């Protein structure tokens, strides 16, 4: 979801999920079935945006504070575009309070400072540390601020989207559901091949979040296709270099691999050492590089996450809550579009961020 500076273990569990989907540079625009996306593909995340008069139905939210992973991160910028689109619709201003670089502690402090000194009525956050941010979110909610967690739920339980902080809203997904979709894609890539040898390039073995995703992948694969055989489970990480090495190790031990799954960054590296005519590749991420690879037939599929709509839906849901509505407090981002990003599925969409910067 990277540059080497991201490999700090501060906030490591959610960093792994961040890396599974994020690039480090600027992004391009995304077409979304669930939300209007801003049209300026080259614009970076703005410090603030001007707002139109509040339409009927929003009397409370005048300012939305956005806390992304870091300002120049292209995944953050893609989500911010959706936040800005939603804010424009409800007539609110957007304040981008993302840290300058990946820094979970600085991100939490920015939330706490805004709660104490700021004047935003709605927070949308991409938490770098889901456990630490849960505390900051509770403080904001206790102060009367509406808080929406985008992309990842807040708290230590990786199996549920249900809010682990009372009053919190969530627009996102769990690593468990992500792992299950990846396994289903692998099973579909296997088709009728018997046996079908599958290699899984997991993220970081030391991280609980990655372990939860891996466990979901393994159990779902076994149930989805009885002919699928997991012959390699190697740490692939979140860079092309680590993915290339993992693919080489997997192939050396198991030369007859038919399907290989890993982070989109790892699969970018793996594609340089596998024969795409023999090995079907699945990347966990919807980066521009992944889109290009699937469209060109180099990869079987990608994980099709709707980043722009995630930001948009966070603002719309938050505004409804802030104005006294009683909507469902959870939006599953896997329902914003079909997450199984085969070539036919992604044909009507455009990418929104880069894995390479």
What are these regions (language model features)?
Residues 65-68, 118-128, 146-151, 200, ...:
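Periplasmic-binding protein-like
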